[in-house]
């Protein structure tokens, strides 16, 4: 049965997920706050700033009118930058009140809210009371929009405490190149999704400095240990971190030239200033803000996260990357598994 799905956010991932939903025989409305982007998608069926050369289905409808996008939708998918999640949720709840709708909410954004350090599902649940929505489901895992656009094989996770809602999202997105697994551990899935971006900056920096595979593998492995420690402290299942949204997402983000966070770290490793890197990228680098959140949460919980602290020192305290690497290597000997 055809369902109307509203996708909020027409960046790389949002527009490609809209394409998946359209291909799976849904009526898809793609909301953007840019008139020029909506016009390009509707008239040329392209999104050149985000996915150059990709042709979108002519049946996807783009709009800057949130009410038009959401009216009659059985599900609403958030794929907007973390910094505007709360604002968009506030706008959405007013529309839902007016329309008298109660859709399933899905989000595929990765990061934490700046300042509060809250997970994205927490922010959405705060701003959209349960009387105006069904469950909130997290869609996350090792995925690059460019590869899904080419219909490369991709596996990700739909997480919700209510597995029936996770299974609903599974059925909406799954096809012959995109496979969805379900998980009840929302905390673990969102934690892995957010904090892997921090480690990707570090791995990118190692590459920029000319370090080899050994160093990168070590940083990824010890970085995963830090992510797991922090997630478990907040109630996550440790097994989640060896799944798609944990080690899977970490691998793809730390090893691919598609990764914005890896590319940012790579440029830092080559000696570029942070401000210059941000300007050159022209897109959101979630790991920069998430690093600050991870560092502050680790301090609050008294959790040892030396790699995160080193990356924080480079990003926020202007420390030299090579000096931070030396300090990490000079730490006293430790047991690996503890």
Swiss-Prot record:
Subcellular location: Cytoplasm
Superkingdom, taxonomy of origin: Bacteria
InterPro entries per record: 6-PGluconate_DH-like_C_sf, 6PGD_dom2, G3P_DH_NAD-dep, G3P_DH_NAD-dep_C, G3P_DH_NAD-dep_N, NAD(P)-bd_dom_sf
Catalytic activity: sn-glycerol 3-phosphate + NAD(+) = dihydroxyacetone phosphate + NADH + H(+); sn-glycerol 3-phosphate + NADP(+) = dihydroxyacetone phosphate + NADPH + H(+)
Family the UniProt entry places it in: Belongs to the NAD-dependent glycerol-3-phosphate dehydrogenase family.
Keywords of the record: Cytoplasm, Lipid biosynthesis, Lipid metabolism, NAD, NADP, Nucleotide-binding, Oxidoreductase, Phospholipid biosynthesis, Phospholipid metabolism
Keyword Oxidoreductase: yes
The name this protein goes by in its record: Glycerol-3-phosphate dehydrogenase [NAD(P)+]
Coiled-coil ranges per UniProt: none
GO biological process, one term: glycerophospholipid metabolic process
Residues binding sn-glycerol 3-phosphate: 110, 141, 143, 196, 249, 259-261
PANTHER family: GLYCEROL-3-PHOSPHATE DEHYDROGENASE, GLYCEROL-3-PHOSPHATE DEHYDROGENASE [NAD(+)] 2, CHLOROPLASTIC
Gene Ontology CC: one annotated term: cytosol
EC number assigned by the record: 1.1.1.94
Single GO molecular function: glycerol-3-phosphate dehydrogenase [NAD(P)+] activity
Pathway entry: Membrane lipid metabolism; glycerophospholipid metabolism
Top-rank EC class of the record's enzyme: oxidoreductase
Binding site for NADPH: 12-13, 34, 110, 145, 260, 284, 286
